[in-house]
Amino acid sequence: MHALITGAGQIGTQLARELSAAGHEVTVLRRGTGAVPGARVISGDAGDRDSLRAIATGTATETSTIDVIFHCIHAAYSAPVWRRELPQRELAVMDIAAELDVPVVFPESVYAYGRGAAQLHEHLPLAPVSPLGEVRAELLAARAAHPARTASVIASDLVGPTATAQSSVVLGMVFTPSAAGRGAWVLGDPDAPHAVTTIPDLARAMIAAIPLASTGDTRLTAPTDTARSQRQMAADAARVAGKPQRTTHRIPGALFALAGPFSPMMREMQHQRYLWAAPSVIVPGRLTTELGLEPTPWEDTLVEWHGGRAVDPAHR
């Protein structure tokens, strides 16, 4: 199989690892020129149809025509930026995929479902309650209306080997300070269960979703372990790192309101706080019930994050 991945962030990079490890040919289209392990890298814009067509057909690379596209590009955490940069590129990718009759698989967040994220299943209607959620709902609707075969794999907040403190709320605000012996700073209710999807689990789910892609867009939930509270996540991270558990601090809502006019990210996070103020749970879907995919156990996720070594409490 020859896979084209658009974007080389935390998801695209992990996908390249998984696919190349399985013996597949991988081409990555990214804006930069940095290498991606296991992949051929081409610098360019996924919104450029001519370039995209040349890559997809093998003309630009003197390789075989691609068999699937994984569309993983993203943009700055801002609803106006998302609306300006994402729809046109998704449309270009779907147009080329329809021409070649190959499927497109997208990673997707829970944002388009609004408060439905409290118990998110694959047949839940779209009901956004934030500007970012509205953009995600528009993208999902466009996929459903396009003749290309598509699949959208829904994940919650992400952690994993390719995540950074800047790209992962859980890593940056909960895991990292707890592992350093400091108190975690959390959004919303520290005791509300909140699902966390590992990036390797999402990547494997996207690969498994290829044959399920269809016109009208197939929506699938990524295998995601039992939801835990942010307070519990902080305690677990401290334990694995061999540090004492510190006080978990709740970020005041007023801080987001005050910083919002000066920071697009803080403004958007203010709108997204509802996801952390109540339970946010992903219900197992077809990838688990039909194909048997299971999430990585939480303890394994913690140990991998801490470099493969949990600290024995008796030797702290």
Feature roles, as predicted:
Residues G32-G34, A39-L100:
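NAD(P)H-binding glycine-rich loop region in Rossmannoid oxidoreductase-like domains
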Residues L91-V135, A151:
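Conserved Rossmann-fold NAD(P)-dependent oxidoreductase catalytic core, especially the SDR/UDP-sugar
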Residues S109, A141-T164:
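Conserved beta-loop-beta element that borders a ligand/cofactor-binding pocket
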Residues G160-M173, A209-L220, K243-P244:
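Glycine/proline-rich active-site loop of Rossmann-fold NAD(P)-dependent oxidoreductases
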Residues V174-T197:
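A conserved pocket-lining segment of Rossmann-fold NAD(P)-dependent short-chain dehydrogenase/reductase
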Residues L187-A192, T218-R228, D236-G242, T289-L291:
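Glycine-rich Rossmann NAD(P)(H)-binding loop
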Residues A234-V281, A314-R316:
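Terminal hydrophobic/aromatic helix or amphipathic segment near a protein terminus
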Residues R286-T288, G292-R316:
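Amphipathic terminal alpha-helices
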